[in-house]
């Protein structure tokens, strides 16, 4: 069987097993599957505000096109960070494009070489990836097992970061 025949057979099998997926519109549905927890991606007021701001600034760009450091910083993001810092009584704030990236950034940059990151066995991948990218030691503890967590904390040296 050549590759084309094999792919066709695989697709036919998926159709028979009801595992064949077809992309479609998802309008008028409640979204339980995306990272849009606050529903901002479809918020009409926000969309109108973005359109208004786009016209007001006469912008010719959709999105940053790159990292903020090199090519993608916007004054509106800096204004948001200033506002968030003020609201939370802090010197500064940093906005990330997703919770995944925020967790990755925190766990890869704040813990240092002599520190330990302990995380629940079933923690999200972004925490594990952030820990892996850091210079800190890192290990998991059994899911929801406070005794295992406590034992590992007592054996630790340096600062201990716990993620649950």
Residues covered by each model-derived region:
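Conserved PLP-anchoring active-site segment centered on the Schiff-base-forming lysine
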Residues: 106-125
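General beta-strand structural signal in soluble alpha/beta enzymes
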Residues: 62-63, 94-97, 119-120, 140, ...
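Short glycine/serine/threonine-rich phosphate/pyrophosphate-binding segments
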Residues: 95, 100-106, 126-127
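Conserved N-terminal alpha-helix of the aminotransferase class I/II PLP-enzyme fold
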Residues: 55-98
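Short, structured coil segments at secondary-structure junctions
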Residues: 113, 134-135
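N-terminal "arm"/small-domain region of PLP-dependent enzymes with the aminotransferase-like
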Residues: 2-62
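Active-site phosphate-binding strand-loop segment of PLP-dependent enzymes
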Residues: 139, 143-164
